[in-house]
Amino acid sequence: MSSFFTCGHSNHAVETWLALLSQHGVEVVVDTRSSPYSKYVPQFDRELMQRSLEQAGIRYLYLGADLGGRPANPAYYDAKGRVLYSRLRDDSRFKAAIARLETGMELYRVALVCGEEDPAHCHRRLLIGRVLTERGHTMLHIRGDGRLESDDAVAAEAHKPLVGTQPALFAELDEDEWRSTASVFPKKAPANSSTH
């Protein structure tokens, strides 16, 4: 099976981020952000990101509408605003996007991209990466300092108990509990539908 990368753009300068991708031979960036725009790092707005990648010789593919961590369908959320990954995984559009990714991974070195530098609690790892690894693919994470980190190392770090706390009794979640680690609802609802 194929291997694939994940990489968060964080608040890097575009040149720094492109250097990280080039350092690891990434040929295609798959943008997995539901909303590929940012008021904090506008250099990573969808169109600007695509242009920068293409100028660097890296292809760009947007699949955030199908693989994003904030699905449009309210049926994929629990009452606390967490995304129900176990349901989303069974969505026909999600499945089609996974199949498209797998086809691309046979031909190119692919990186799944979103905004978070740390993949530990990001949907690109917890949702998309989990589905792909369950299908036999290997996930590697390009970190902000340039190092490549195995998913086992990320998982081990994510499950370390905080100082002075007890370790969790049940490290693995059953399918009914497989969901985002935090609410993805906005902290403050928009005033109207045209406000972002």
Each predicted region: which residue ranges?
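Residues lining hydrophobic/aromatic ligand-binding pockets adjacent to catalytic sites
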Residues: 1-196
